[in-house]
Amino acid sequence: MSDAPLILLAAGGTGGHLFPAEALGVVLMKRGLRVRLVTDSRAMRYSGLFSADMIDVVPSETVRGRTPWALARTGLMLGAGTAKALALMLRLKPAAVVGFGGYPTLPPLFAARALRIPTLIHDSNAVMGRANRLLSKGVTAIATSLPGVLDRDPTLSAKTTTTGTPMRPAILAAAAVPFAPLAAEGPLRLLVVGGSQGARVMADIVPGAIEQLDPALQPRLVLTQQVREEDMARVRAVYDRLKITCELAPFFNDLPARLAASQLVVSRSGAGTVAELAAIGRPSILVPLPGALDQDQFANAGVLADAGGAIRIVQADFTPERLADEIAALAADPQKLTAMVTAARTVGRLDAADRLADLVVKVANI
C-alpha cells in the first residue's frame, strides 16, 4: 500500500466540500490507492475518513471585500498557501490532485499545475463556484454533478464529465431505507436543518410556523431541528409551550439516518444537501441562501423543484404563514409526499463516487 499511487484531495473546510471528497476517498482506497486531504483548519472539526495524519492544512483566504487591503491580504495568504503546497507536493509526489471547490483548493491546484501534475476539479452546484471557475481553464479535466453546467463554454464542456455528487457510505445506507408513507392521522416526522453551519432563519421562522398550524396537526409532529446554541432557549420555549415532540441540537452527527427517517425536510439548498435529498429521496421545502453572487443555492433548489421533489421558497417569501401553509397542505395530501419521494430520486445518482473515481484514474494515467 505504501507504494500505491497517491491522490491528493483538496477541499474547502465545510461539509458541502468535504463530504464528496470523503466519498471519493473511500472508493479510491478500496481500489488500492492512497489518499490525503489538503484543506484549511476548519476541516479538523469533522470526523470521518480523514484522520489527523491524513490531513495537510495550507494557508488560504476567502476573498472578502474589494479594498486594496483586503485584496492584498488575500493575495499574501494564497501565495503563502501555494508555497506550502508546492513543498508538500514535491515531498509527496501525488499522481493527481482533485479539487472539490472552496478557496482553500486554490493553493494546491495552483501548485499542481506549476509542477505539471494532472488535475481535476469537481463541482456539485448547478452553477459552478467561483474558486472552481478560477481553476477551470487550467485543469486537466472537470467533473460536475449535474448536466449542462458548462454547456455555454465549448472549451470547458469538451473536458467535462457529468458524474453526480459522490455519496458517503452513510448516505448510501440511508438511501436503502424505504420511505414511510404518511398515515392519515399518524405522526409527521419533520426535519429542519440549515446546512453544516446552521441557519438562523430557521430559528426565526419555523417556531412561528409550527405555532400557526391547526391544533389537531401540532400533536402529530415529531420534530427534529438544527438550532444554533445562541438560538436554543427561545426556540425550545416555543415548542415547550406548544407541547411539541421535538429534538433540538446545534449539529447532528447522524444526519443521514435522520434524513432517512424523515417524511418532510425543511432546509437550505446547498449542493451537498440537495444531492443527499435526491439520493435518499425525501420530500423537502428548500430555502436558498440569499445574496450569493452566483445564486447557486437558488439554482440547486430549482433542480429538485423542477423534478417535483421539492418546494422552493425564496427567503423573502419564507414567512411563518407561508411555511405553515405548505406544511399543512402536504400533511393533508400524503400521496403528494410519496410522489415527491419518487421525483426526488430521479435526480439522485448513487454511483457517482465510482464514476468520479474512474475519471480520476484516467486523468492520473494509473
From Swiss-Prot:
Annotated UDP-N-acetyl-alpha-D-glucosamine binding sites: T14, G15, G16, N125, R168, S196, Q297
Localization of this protein: Cell inner membrane
Pathways involved: Cell wall biogenesis; peptidoglycan biosynthesis
UniProt keyword terms in alphabetical order: Cell cycle, Cell division, Cell inner membrane, Cell membrane, Cell shape, Cell wall biogenesis/degradation, Glycosyltransferase, Membrane, Peptidoglycan synthesis, Transferase
GO cellular component, as recorded: plasma membrane
Topology relative to the membrane: Peripheral membrane protein
EC number, UniProt record: 2.4.1.227
Annotated Pfam families: Glyco_tran_28_C, Glyco_transf_28
MF (Gene Ontology): UDP-N-acetyl-D-glucosamine:N-acetylmuramoyl-L-alanyl-D-glutamyl-meso-2,6-diaminopimelyl-D-alanyl-D-alanine-diphosphoundecaprenol 4-beta-N-acetylglucosaminlytransferase activity; undecaprenyldiphospho-muramoylpentapeptide beta-N-acetylglucosaminyltransferase activity
UniProt keyword annotation of ATP-binding present: no
UniProt family annotation: Belongs to the glycosyltransferase 28 family. MurG subfamily.
Reported function: Cell wall formation. Catalyzes the transfer of a GlcNAc subunit on undecaprenyl-pyrophosphoryl-MurNAc-pentapeptide (lipid intermediate I) to form undecaprenyl-pyrophosphoryl-MurNAc-(pentapeptide)GlcNAc (lipid intermediate II).
Identification of the protein by name: UDP-N-acetylglucosamine--N-acetylmuramyl-(pentapeptide) pyrophosphoryl-undecaprenol N-acetylglucosamine transferase
Protein species of origin: Rhodopseudomonas palustris (strain HaA2)
The encoding gene: murG
